[in-house]
Every structure is written in structure tokens, then in C-alpha cells.
């Protein structure tokens, strides 16, 4: 069982989407169920509407799920599991205040040591715990042995007990910490493989320790994906516009192109342009590079152009939403545009009212002729017919004709454009 477990705290990051895509692909390859779990336990940071936005984005990428969970609905199970650990003396109540802990952290810092919980409350007698009325958290006792696990990308990783520490699993308000809720949910939902970003590597031994302490002995496999760098080679920030999946989509980049690019990013693929369904046939998580991958917007736009060309005409017409059969004309314009947004602007420039400036007189002459002109198969025949009937020459002929046909003073060769614009010429003459 594979899962994607985002938090509804902001726009989906391309790193999150990459994890979703990889989990989905592997689930399909293994013929296993795929889980979508919304991790909403951080109520202060949750943003209204983001849960639905996550589902909408996954649907756009043709990522479907068989099971859907809301983490906060598992709160009773989180509390039951925490109580079980306390009753078995595997976890304990900690009454240390934030101020006390902060003072100890400062002391460790001055001594040049990494702070570790010193066990102040670990050996409190039961009666002392019962009689103490101070707020408390619950800490899981640190493991007694080295924690090891194998990662499909990073190989074998190990963590010593002192580096895992006796960490908090339940807060003073009786809500679970991220690691505890995540570990318990993965256990309850029978997740068998976790693919996520490498920023979660340090969480893995804690989650393994939680499940082991609860007596869960089913093996879990992992793949921690390397970080994505920006074009300057620095870790991509969530504040950077093109790190947001929503921004990429709104910019007119197709979901299929984004998926293509993210699968290819830092990976060995048999070809450069492919669909998600094609990738399912050959994708191998172990071939993903350990090294950070650098995001290249120009490369993504190049891939997007190819995916626009691959779209079926009726589907592209729906996307353009201009109530015309413009698919072939739009695909022709991919030579100078890279996104659906740019294509729409090109199409609107062609079919909207135009400013002819100094060529207003010539425009009126051409407009009348174009309303009924014979639409020859060959551009040269069309051009010569129009030249002869208009008595216009040079710039005074070609510039207004270009504006009529393209809405711009610059653009593709009219001879190249003609086969795609021909059927619209009578209409353009009446705008």
C-alpha cells in the first residue's frame, strides 16, 4: 500500500507533487491500493479550501486513490496508542516547561554540544506523576539499539539512539505530534512503502521506533527523494512562484507536461517526452539520482510545447475555450509560444478587433477583398490574387495583411501560416 499525505497549509509544492506521482506510479506497478491522507492536525496552520484544492490538483494529473483519510479523524486512535505506550512504560509524562527546556538548550549550545533531553521526568514515580498538576507532554523513551532501514535511493541508513532521543509524541493539548500521528496512521492503514522528500529522512527512525514500540513488526520500505534546487542551484523555496503547482497550471503548463518533467528530473528515462501511463511501464524508483536535481523552467516549457502538440484536437479546442476549431492553428503557433496561456493570447489577438494605425486605408481595401476572395490551396496564388485586385505593394500590402491574419506586426511567415489560417480568412475580414 502506498500513500500521499499532504498538509492543507499552503499551495502544493512541486516536490510534494513529485512524491505523489512516484507513489501513484509504484502503486500501479505493484497493483496495490493508493491512499490519499490529509494531515490536518496542525489546526493553526490549516488554510480553508486547501483540502479540496489538493484533490482537484491530483485529479488534473489523473492521480486517483482508493482510500481517503483525514488525519484528525484518527485522534482517538492516536490517544489510545499513546496511553498504551505509557501503560507499558515505553513512554512517560514530561512536566518540563518550555522555559526550562530552552535554558538547557542554551547551556548545551554554550558548551558546543547538541542538545538531548536529559531524562528529568523519565524516572518519576507513578505517585509523583499522579499528584503533579502541571501541564505535561508524553515522550517516547529513546531506543536502546541502532535503528537501521534500507532506502531505495540512499541505500542503508542507520541512526544511533542518542540521535533519536526521547522525543515528544503527544502535546499538552492531547494532540499528537507529526511523527506520532504519521507513524500510527501508516500502521493502521497498512502502508507498506513510503516515498517522500529527503527532508523526512530524520523522521524515519522516529516513526520506525514508534511502530516497533507498539509491537508492529511489518516491514516498511522507503525512498527519500533528493531536494529540488532552483535555477541558481539553491534549495527551492516555497516562496518562489514556479515552485507552486497552482502557479504552473495557471501559467498554462499542462499537467501531463509537469508530470513528464518531474518524472524525468534527476532520473534516467528511456525517452524525453512521455505520458504518465507510459512511465508506469518502465519507471524504476531505484534509478532516481541521490544528487539534488536543478529545476529548469526552460526545459519544462520545451516539454510543454511537445505535450500541446500531442493533445487531441477536440480536447485542445475545449482547453482554448474560444468556440472555434483552432487546434491545428494553435499547434502551429507552438513554434513561438510555450504555454496554453500564451496560445490563448495569440488566438485572441487573431480574432479580436485590431488597431491598424497608419494602415487604416489599406486595411479597408484588403478587408473588402478578403470577404469574398477565393481561398486558393497555395499561398502564392492567394497572395498574387490579392495583390492584383488591391493594387497595393510592399509594406502597404504585407503589413495590414499580416495584422489582419495575426493581430501582430511580427510573427510567422505568412506562407507558413496560410494553410492553418485559410479557413478563417472570410471571418477575419468581417471583424
UniProtKB/Swiss-Prot annotation:
Q: EC number(s) for this protein?
A: 6.1.1.17
Sequence motif 'HIGH' region, location on chain? 6-16
Q: Which InterPro entries match?
A: aa-tRNA-synth_I_cd-bd, aa-tRNA-synth_I_codon-bd_sub2, aa-tRNA-synth_I_CS, aa_tRNA-synth_I_cd-bd_sf, Glu-tRNA-ligase_bac/mito, Glu/Gln-tRNA-synth, Glu/Gln-tRNA-synth_Ib_cat-dom, GluQ/Sye
Does this UniProt record's set of keywords contain Nucleotide-binding? Answer: yes
List the subcellular locations.
Cytoplasm
Under the heading PROSITE patterns, the entry gives: AA_TRNA_LIGASE_I (PS00178)
**Gene Ontology MF annotations:** ATP binding; glutamate-tRNA ligase activity; tRNA binding
One GO BP annotation is: glutamyl-tRNA aminoacylation
Instruction: State the span of motif ('KMSKS' region).
Output: 235-239
Q: Which Gene3D superfamilies match?
A: 1.10.10.350, HUPs
Catalytic function, reaction form: tRNA(Glu) + L-glutamate + ATP = L-glutamyl-tRNA(Glu) + AMP + diphosphate
Where is ATP bound in this sequence?
Answer: 238
Which keywords belong to this entry? Aminoacyl-tRNA synthetase, ATP-binding, Cytoplasm, Ligase, Nucleotide-binding, Protein biosynthesis
Q: Which domain of life is it from?
A: Bacteria
Q: What are its GO cellular component terms?
A: cytosol
Q: One Pfam annotation, family name?
A: Anticodon_2
Protein function: Catalyzes the attachment of glutamate to tRNA(Glu) in a two-step reaction: glutamate is first activated by ATP to form Glu-AMP and then transferred to the acceptor end of tRNA(Glu).
Subunit info here reads:
Monomer.
Q: Which family, according to the similarity comment?
A: Belongs to the class-I aminoacyl-tRNA synthetase family. Glutamate--tRNA ligase type 1 subfamily.
Could you tell me what this protein is called? Glutamate--tRNA ligase 1
Amino acid at each position: 500500500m502506498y500513500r500521499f499525505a499532504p498538509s492543507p497549509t499552503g499551495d502544493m509544492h512541486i516536490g510534494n507533487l513529485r512524491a505523489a506521482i512516484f507513489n501513484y506510479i509504484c502503486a500501479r506497478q505493484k497493483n496495490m491500493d493508493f491512499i490519499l491522507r490529509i494531515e490536518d492536525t496542525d489546526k493553526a496552520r490549516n488554510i480553508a479550501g486547501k483540502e479540496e484544492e489538493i484533490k482537484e490538483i491530483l485529479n488534473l494529473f489523473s492521480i486517483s486513490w482508493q482510500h481517503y483519510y483525514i488525519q484528525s479523524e484518527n485522534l482517538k486512535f492516536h490517544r489510545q496508542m499513546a496511553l498504551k505506550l505509557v501503560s507499558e512504560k515505553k513512554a512517560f509524562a514530561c512536566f518540563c516547561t518550555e522555559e526550562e527546556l530552552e535554558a538547557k538548550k542554551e547551556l548545551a549550545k554554550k558548551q558546543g554540544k547538541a542538545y538531548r533531553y536529559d531524562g528529568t521526568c523519565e524516572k518519576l514515580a507513578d505517585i509523583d506523576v499522579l499528584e503533579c498538576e502541571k501541564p505535561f507532554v508524553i515522550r517516547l523513551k529513546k531506543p536502546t539499539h541502532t535503528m537501521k532501514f534500507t532506502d531505495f535511493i540512499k541505500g542503508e541508513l542507520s541512526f544511533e539512539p542518542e540521535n533519536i532521543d526521547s522525543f515528544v509524541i503527544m502535546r499538552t493539548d492531547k494532540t499528537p505530534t507529526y511523527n506520532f500521528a504519521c507513524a500510527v496512521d501508516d500502521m493502521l492503514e497498512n502502508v507498506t512503502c513510503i516515498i517522500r522528500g529527503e527532508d523526512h529522512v530524520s523522521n524515519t527512525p522516529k516513526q520506525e521506533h514508534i511502530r516497533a514500540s507498539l509491537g508492529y513488526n511489518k516491514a516498511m520500505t522507503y525512498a527519500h527523494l533528493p531536494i529540488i534546487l532552483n535555477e541558481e542551484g539553491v534549495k527551492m523555496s516555497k516562496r518562489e512562484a514556479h515552485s507552486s503547482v497552482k502557479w504552473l497550471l495557471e501559467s498554462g503548463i499542462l499537467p501531463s507536461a509537469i508530470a513528464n518533467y518531474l518524472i524525468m528530473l534527476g532520473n534516467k528515462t528511456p525517452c524525453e517526452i512521455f505520458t504518465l501511463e507510459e512511465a508506469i511501464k518502465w519507471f524504476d524508483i531505484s534509478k532516481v539520482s541521490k544528487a539534488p536535481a536543478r529545476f529548469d523552467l526552460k526545459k519544462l516549457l520545451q516539454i510543454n510545447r511537445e505535450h500541446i502538440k500531442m493533445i487531441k484536437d477536440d480536447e485542445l479546442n475545449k482547453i482554448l475555450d474560444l468556440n472555434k476549431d483552432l487546434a491545428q492553428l494553435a499547434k502551429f503557433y507552438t513554434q513561438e509560444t510555450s504555454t496554453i496561456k500564451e496560445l490563448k493570447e495569440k488566438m485572441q489577438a487573431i480574432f479580436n478587433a485590431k488597431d491598424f494605425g497608419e494602415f487604416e486605408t489599406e486595411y479597408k481595401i484588403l478587408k473588402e477583398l478578403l470577404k469574398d476572395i477565393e481561398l486558393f490551396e497555395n499561398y502564392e496564388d492567394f497572395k498574387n490574387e490579392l495583390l492584383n485586385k488591391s493594387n497595393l505593394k510592399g509594406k502597404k500590402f504585407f503589413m495590414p495583411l499580416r495584422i489582419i491574419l495575426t493581430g501582430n506586426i511580427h510573427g510567422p511567415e505568412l506562407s507558413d501560416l496560410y494553410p492553418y489560417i485559410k479557413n478563417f480568412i472570410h471571418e477575419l475580414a468581417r471583424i
